[in-house]
């Protein structure tokens, strides 16, 4: 039983931290506390990521519509997630630092396929899925040099910003967040904030840290829109602009 507890604890902390906590009872060790907190947050984010975009998927399936969802934004978001996943996986970073990207990628590609399908592009939705599977094989099988993966990861910030902000622009034009799921938006924002801390602790990779800072900013914009447009039906912005249109002589 003691061995099982030890093995479980060592999954969350280093042997040095285990000794500090369980042998010397030094519970005020700051570096060990930070490492344990980071590992715990990372695992919590991974657990949450299993379902983070499921509300969005269900909302599309129930309405049989991708209204208000910018497909370009979804595809760019998918690329950013996939490049991040591959970069971390091939670098050999701890799974707790990037494991959520695996589940986010699966759910995001599902959203992209559903939006294409319900927009009447059924053949394209199938081709898109096949193309994505091929891309992931190329990125994660060792066929892609590490130098290329680093370059791709460095491009993640503009890809991520363009993808998220194009969705924000779509929301602005529509005067509504359409079929965007509030639960998904909130969890994505919270996850990106937590990932800044876990990335500092577990990888120290400046490129990854900067990526999550950019992600937090972009997610905060969409979260702000969600709050602003909460009780506003689609088309309010357009109607308001028409209502303010000055009268012409014909109207008189």
From Swiss-Prot:
GO terms for cellular component: membrane. Residues 34-100, 157-211 form the PQ-loop domain. Its main location: membrane. Keywords: Membrane, Repeat, Transmembrane, Transmembrane helix, Transport. The chain crosses the membrane at residues 41-61, 69-89, 98-118, 126-146, 148-168, 180-200, 207-227. InterPro entries: MannP-dilichol_defect-1 (IPR016817), PQ-loop_rpt (IPR006603). It is found in: Membrane. Pfam families: PQ-loop. One of its GO terms (biological process) is oligosaccharide biosynthetic process. It is a multi-pass membrane protein. Belongs to the MPDU1 (TC 2.A.43.3) family. This is Mannose-P-dolichol utilization defect 1 protein homolog.
